[in-house]
């Protein structure tokens, strides 16, 4: 999302809105995106560029968090570690509309919900809302440590050979 805004749209927008009680991983960037202080404890200083205090299922909270640096909104369609809380379908639809209105990318973290774990290949299919970017892992590798980020065709302009890497090097 950051790279797309800077390389393709020429905008200095880098902040990603995430949600309280979310969990996005344990790398430095993904734990910074996580909305749980207990996960971040002991890792300061954390990288800038994430706002992790939006209230899940509250569109007004997201609207209030958007500023001129915001490039994307990222959420889990089911907050697993946050208490197994599913996103409200109306909230997800409103979030898509809001992102479109404000020129933001919508990112779904499908690490826990993707690959058939919710009854469809990806949970977003059940919401009738298509993200700009989504991530998958866990179920993708069936125990093998692998993950993927998938995005709409418009995003490929931001990536060329060598601009995105793998942990397998």
List PLM regions with ranges.
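Conserved N-terminal phosphate-binding loop of PLP-dependent enzymes in the Aspartate aminotransferase
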Residues: 1-169
């Amino acid at each position: 999302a950051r790279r797309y805004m800077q390389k393709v749209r020429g905008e200095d927008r880098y902040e990603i809105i995430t949600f309280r009680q979310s969990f996005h991983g344990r790398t430095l960037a993904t734990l910074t995106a996580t909305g749980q202080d207990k996960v971040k404890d002991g890792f300061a200083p954390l990288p800038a560029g994430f706002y992790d205090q939006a209230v899940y299922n509250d569109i007004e909270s997201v609207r209030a968090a958007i500023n001129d640096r915001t490039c994307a909104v990222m959420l889990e369609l089911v907050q697993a570690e946050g208490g197994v809380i599913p996103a409200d379908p109306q909230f997800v639809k409103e979030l898509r509309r809001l992102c479109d209105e404000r020129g933001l990318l919508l990112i779904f973290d499908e690490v826990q919900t993707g690959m058939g774990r919710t009854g469809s290949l990806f949970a977003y299919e059940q919401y009738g809302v298509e993200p700009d970017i989504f991530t998958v892992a866990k179920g993708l590798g069936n125990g093998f440590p692998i993950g993927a980020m998938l995005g709409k065709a418009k995003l490929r302009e931001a990536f060329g050979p060598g601009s995105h890497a793998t942990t397998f090097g």
